[in-house]
């Protein structure tokens, strides 16, 4: 429910919402629509930006402790977490990343905003295609890390043993 994924997992944002619209949204999520009146409030928008960056730093620290891999907190996080199936677009996302990778290999000076693709998935034990897609994601991650001129602009990480604790960190 929204209380777990907003209030518990994102206490900074919950505190801002409490200040701006009160605590009623915690029981009645429809009240979150009241936050729209702050869409042009520069002070609130700056606090949102700061909250987002602090949360990215928290996740980066969590991920680094868990895997030893660091993530650029100034990069755009593109997150796709769900059970892996051929039809759930993970493969399409991987093919898009390969396209970006090839463009950056051709032109390392290409002006792109650094982006971190974060995958988390589980595959059913007998679902070989899903396991192969996970292998492809991991191979692409290693290839990007070994390519100078690309690794500073593009990163792919795979969250192994994805669970609720990891989801809450995200």
What are these regions (language model features)?
Residues 1-170:
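Catalytic cores of carbohydrate-active enzymes across secretory and cytosolic contexts
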